[in-house]
Amino acid sequence: MSDIAARVKKIVVEHLNVDEDKVVDSASFIDDLGADSLDTVELVMAFEEEFGIEIPDDAAETIQTFGDATKFISEAQ
């Protein structure tokens, strides 16, 4: 697992209080990990802070899974 993926996973586990084993590339924040819309906004803000990037609103709407988040952040770095 890349450093970025490990850091994203840590944020997801801490913010959503889920088991690390459930955080896989295809895991939907809402459908699989129990997040609501506020949780997803907080995740995006945490990603921005952790990685020193800005995620525009239109891009944030496309980040639905752990894999989406990791891919977006990797490309934004």
From Swiss-Prot:
GO terms for cellular component: cytosol; membrane. One of its GO terms (molecular function) is acyl carrier activity. GO terms for biological process: lipid A biosynthetic process. The keyword Phosphoprotein applies. Disulfide bonds: none annotated. Residues 2-77 form the Carrier domain. InterPro entries: ACP, ACP-like_sf, PKS_PP-bd, PP-bd_ACP, Ppantetheine_attach_site. It is found in: Cytoplasm. 4'-phosphopantetheine is transferred from CoA to a specific serine of apo-ACP by AcpS. This modification is essential for activity because fatty acids are bound in thioester linkage to the sulfhydryl of the prosthetic group. The modification O-(pantetheine 4'-phosphoryl)serine is found at S37. SUPFAM superfamilies: ACP-like (SSF47336). The keyword Lipid metabolism applies. Pathway: Lipid metabolism; fatty acid biosynthesis. Keywords: Cytoplasm, Fatty acid biosynthesis, Fatty acid metabolism, Lipid biosynthesis, Lipid metabolism, Phosphopantetheine, Phosphoprotein. Carrier of the growing fatty acid chain in fatty acid biosynthesis. Belongs to the acyl carrier protein (ACP) family. This is Acyl carrier protein. It comes from Jannaschia sp. (strain CCS1).
